[in-house]
Amino acid sequence: MKTNPLFLVPLCLIILSCTNTSEKDLIEQIDPTEPITYSEHIKPVFDSNCINCHSSPAINGAGVSLTTYNNVKNSIENTNLIDRINWQPGQGGFMPLGGTRLPQNLIDLIIQWQSEGFVE
């Protein structure tokens, strides 16, 4: 059975068009006029990236739980949480431990939430 090689060209084009070019393509963009809130924007970031260790109670040597609004707010205000998620993998204290660095737009979102006064 012979296969028409022209069939492969459209197939390759379809496959290539399904790729993304940046991490921002993978994350829903937020309306810049909308206030950043813990419940809608910040909690999902921490739930997806932090509570494997920073649960209640914290495990794997994690020093604090990051499961509630007050836990996260206090960690940002009283520890170097934002610095630790900003560091590059391999730096001592980098978070998430053993994971990959959060996309910059998520780090920026957390910083913006802080600058807007930690809206719940």
Describe every region a protein language model picked out.
Residues 18-120:
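Aromatic- and Gly/Pro-enriched helix-to-coil junctions and flexible linker segments
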Residues 1-17:
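Sec-dependent bacterial lipoprotein signal peptides
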